[in-house]
C-alpha cells in the first residue's frame, strides 16, 4: 500500500529535517556513549552467535497531545501550552527527526551484525514494516523507513486511511463477561494493596499535588466553572465494554491527560522553565509527573487477564513473525498500550528504565526481540531489549550511531531461564507466546 496519505506533508517535513541534521552533526561530537545491549556484546558472544532476525514492536515518536487547547487540557491551567508543530494527536516535527535517527541507527546496527550488507535494499520477504493506521503511527513508520532504507524506494503497510485504529493494534476487549469484569477488577485492585483502587491513587498524591501546582489548577478556568479544582477523586471508576478499550473516570484519568501533555511539552520545549510553565522542576519532579502515565497504563492494560485479552492479535502476529524463515526484520508501529499489554501478557518481570523520565514505555521506545543462532550447534535463542532514546537524546536531538547508541535495557521473562549471555531458548519463548494465546482462549 502506498504511504503518501499522511496528513503532514512528508516531503516538506523531510526538507526541514535535512537542515536539522546539518546542525546536529556538531552536537554528536560532544555526546558520551550510553549503554546499549546491542553494542556491548562481548568477543566471546560474537564468536559463538550470529544474528538471524529482529522483530520490533515500537511506540510512535513525539506527538502533540491527544486533546486540543479547547478541551479540558486548555481549561485546566492558567498558562498557555506550547505551540505544537502538529495537530492534536499527530506526530510533531521533532518526532519525525528523532524517528529518522532511530531508523538510521537500526540500519547501522544490523549492518554491523551482518544481517544486511551496507547499501543493500532488502526485498519484501526480508523486511516487514507495518503501522497502525493513526497519523502518528503511519508518520513514525515513514520517518523510520526513510532513515532505515533511504534509497530503496520502499513502501510500508498500513491497513486504513489515517486516522483509524487497525484491529491488530487496537487494545480493545474482544471478550467481556461478568466473570471477566470481576477478575479484572480483582487484579487491578491488587495493585493498590489493601486499599485497592483508592490505594493506587494515594500512591500518586505527591504527583497529583505537583501537577496542581504546576498548572495553577485552583485558579484555572475549569475551576472557576466549577469543574476541576483539585485531583482528589480517588474512587476511579473502571469500565470494560466489548469492542472497546478499557476505560476509566476520576482524577487518575484527568491527571494522565495533563501529565501526558506536560511530558510532551518538556520534550518539545528546550527551555526548562518554559516547559514547566515558569516553575523550577527537577528531574525527579518530571519523573513524578511521568509516574502518573505509568500507573494509568498499568491500571488499564497490565492486569494479566486484561493484557491477555487486548494483546491477543499482536501476540499471534509477533509469534508468526518470529517463526518466519524468510523474514530478517519486522517493524510494527503502535502505542505504549501495545508494549504494556504484550509485556504483561508474556509475563515480563517488573522493570524501571534508567536515563529517562518515562520509566516504562518512553516515547518512541521499541520492544526488540532478537533471534540469535549458535554458530556451532545451529540452536536458536531469543534476547529481548527495550530500546529507547534517553531524555537527553530526545530533548537535545542528539545524533545516534554505533558509538552513541540509544539506551537499551535487557528485559527478563518471569519463569524462564536465560544463559550467561541473557539469551532464552527459542522454544521456551515461543512456548510463553503459546501460553498467553491459550490463556486468551480460556477467557469466558
Q: Predicted segment positions?
A:
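N-terminal secretory signal peptides that target proteins for export/translocation
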Residues: 1-17
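Alpha-helical and His/Cys-centered functional microenvironments
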Residues: 12, 22, 339
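N-terminal leader/targeting signatures
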Residues: 16-17, 26, 41
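Short beta-strand/loop turn elements enriched in aromatics
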Residues: 19-20, 66
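Bacterial N-terminal signal peptides
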Residues: 21-32
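Sec/Tat signal peptide C-region and signal peptidase I cleavage site
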Residues: 33-37
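Signature for phosphate-centric chemistry
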Residues: 38-126, 132-330, 334-444
Amino acid at each position: 500500500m502506498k504511504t503518501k496519505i499522511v496528513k503532514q506533508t512528508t516531503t516538506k517535513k523531510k526538507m526541514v529535517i535535512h537542515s536539522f541534521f546539518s546542525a546536529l552533526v556538531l552536537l554528536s561530537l560532544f555526546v558520551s556513549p550510553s549503554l546499549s545491549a546491542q553494542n556491548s556484546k562481548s568477543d566471546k558472544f560474537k564468536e559463538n552467535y550470529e544474528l538471524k532476525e529482529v522483530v520490533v514492536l515500537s511506540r510512535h515518536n513525539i506527538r502533540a497531545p491527544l486533546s486540543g487547547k479547547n478541551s479540558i487540557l486548555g481549561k485546566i491551567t492558567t498558562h498557555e501550552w506550547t505551540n505544537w508543530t502538529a495537530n492534536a494527536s499527530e506526530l510533531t516535527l521533532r518526532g519525525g527527526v528523532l524517528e529518522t535517527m532511530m531508523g538510521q541507527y537500526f540500519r547501522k546496527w544490523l549492518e554491523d551484525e551482518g544481517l544486511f550488507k551496507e547499501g543493500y535494499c532488502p526485498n519484501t520477504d526480508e523486511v516487514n514494516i507495518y503501522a497502525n493506521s493513526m497519523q502518528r503511527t503511519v508518520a513514525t513508520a515513514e520517518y523510520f523507513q526513510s532513515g532505515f532504507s533511504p534509497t530503496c524506494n520502499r513502501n510500508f503497510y498500513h491497513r486504513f486511511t489515517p486516522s483509524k485504529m487497525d484491529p491488530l493494534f487496537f487494545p480493545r476487549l474482544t471478550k467481556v463477561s461478568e466473570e471477566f469484569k470481576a477478575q479484572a477488577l480483582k487484579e487491578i485492585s491488587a495493585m493498590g494493596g489493601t486499599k485497592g483502587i483508592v490505594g493506587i491513587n494515594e500512591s500518586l498524591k505527591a504527583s497529583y499535588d505537583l501537577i496542581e501546582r504546576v498548572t495553577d489548577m485552583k485558579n484555572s478556568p475549569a475551576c472557576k466553572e466549577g469543574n476541576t479544582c483539585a485531583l482528589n477523586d480517588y474512587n476511579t471508576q473502571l469500565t470494560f465494554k466489548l469492542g472497546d478499550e478499557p476505560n476509566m473516570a476520576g482524577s487518575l484519568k484527568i491527571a494522565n491527560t495533563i501529565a501526558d501533555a506536560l511530558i510532551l511539552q518538556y520534550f518539545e520545549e528546550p527551555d526548562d522553565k518554559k516547559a514547566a510553565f515558569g516553575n523550577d522542576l527537577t528531574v525527579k519532579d518530571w519523573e513524578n509527573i511521568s509516574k502518573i502515565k505509568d500507573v494509568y497504563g498499568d491500571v488499564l492494560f497490565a492486569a494479566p487477564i486484561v493484557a491477555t485479552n487486548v494483546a491477543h492479535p499482536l501476540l499471534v502476529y509477533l509469534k508468526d513473525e518470529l517463526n518466519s524463515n524468510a523474514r530478517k526484520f519486522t517493524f510494527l508501529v503502535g502505542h505504549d498500550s501495545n508494549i504494556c499489554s504484550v509485556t504483561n501478557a508474556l509475563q515480563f518481570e517488573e522493570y524501571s528504565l534508567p536515563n529517562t523520565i518515562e520509566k516504562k514505555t518512553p516515547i518512541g521506545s521499541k520492544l526488540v526481540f532478537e533471534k540469535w543462532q549458535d554458530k556451532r550447534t545451529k540452536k536458536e535463542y531469543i534476547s529481548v531489549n527495550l530500546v529507547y532514546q534517553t531524555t537527553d537524546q530526545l530533548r537535545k536531538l542528539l545524533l545516534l550511531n554505533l558509538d552513541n547508541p540509544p539506551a537499551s535495557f535487557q528485559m527478563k521473562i518471569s519463569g524462564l531461564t536465560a544463559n550467561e549471555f541473557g539469551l532464552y531458548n527459542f522454544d521456551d519463548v515461543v512456548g510463553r507466546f503459546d501460553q498467553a494465546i491459550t490463556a486468551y482462549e480460556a477467557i469466558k
